[in-house]
Design a protein with these regions (language model features):
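Short beta-strand edge/turn micro-motifs at domain boundaries
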Residues: 129-154
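Short acidic-aromatic low-complexity motifs
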Residues: 43-64
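A short hydrophobic beta-strand element
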Residues: 109-118
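Short, surface-exposed coil-to-beta transition loops
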Residues: 98-101, 126-132
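Boundary at the C-terminal end of the N-terminal hydrophobic targeting segment
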Residues: 27-32
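N-terminal secretory signal peptides
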Residues: 1-8, 22
Length: 154
């Protein structure tokens, strides 16, 4: 049996664990502290980012990332890192997105987690239900990782 070595850095490990935690419902409890002003700002950035997708405006969407931003479309894919790779990855679905419906959002410092249903038209999927983990720094999404809960084929 052939094995392959895979390097997992601390951030990827934490993002994976947080994605699983969010997917299983470990969000803010009813008696949790109110989000800080920074956390509220970070949640708003992610909300605005998700709201931008149905516009199909590539530059508007890319403006949420720094030049060295990263996006991993699913837990089984490698992240697209840097402006060129982000552009190429986003172009694969941008024109098919009809809605990102945010079901829940919470934040801890620079990390924002949302549960959402992404809806598509003229695409292999009708909808995708999952969890997004976003790391926000200086008003930009530096890393975005998505974790699948369920999907519905077209």
């Amino acid at each position: 049996m052939e094995t392959t070595a895979r390097t997992i850095d601390r951030r990827m490990f934490l993002a994976s664990g947080l994605g699983v935690a969010a997917a299983t419902g470990l969000a803010r409890s009813a008696d949790a502290a109110e989000p800080s002003p920074m956390e509220k700002a970070n949640m708003q950035i992610v909300k605005d980012f998700c709201a931008a997708w149905p516009s199909h405006d590539l530059e508007k969407i890319l403006a949420f990332f720094p030049d060295n931003g990263a996006y991993r479309m699913t837990e089984t894919m490698e992240p697209a890192k840097g402006r060129e790779a982000l552009t190429a990855r986003i172009k694969t679905i941008i024109n098919n997105v009809s809605q990102f419906e945010i079901l829940d959002t919470w934040a801890r410092g620079p990390m924002v987690v949302n549960e959402r249903i992404d809806r598509f038209s003229n695409f292999q999927l009708k909808s995708w239900h999952g969890v997004g983990v976003f790391f926000v720094k200086d008003g930009k999404i530096v890393e975005w990782y998505d974790y699948t809960i369920a999907s519905e084929r077209a």
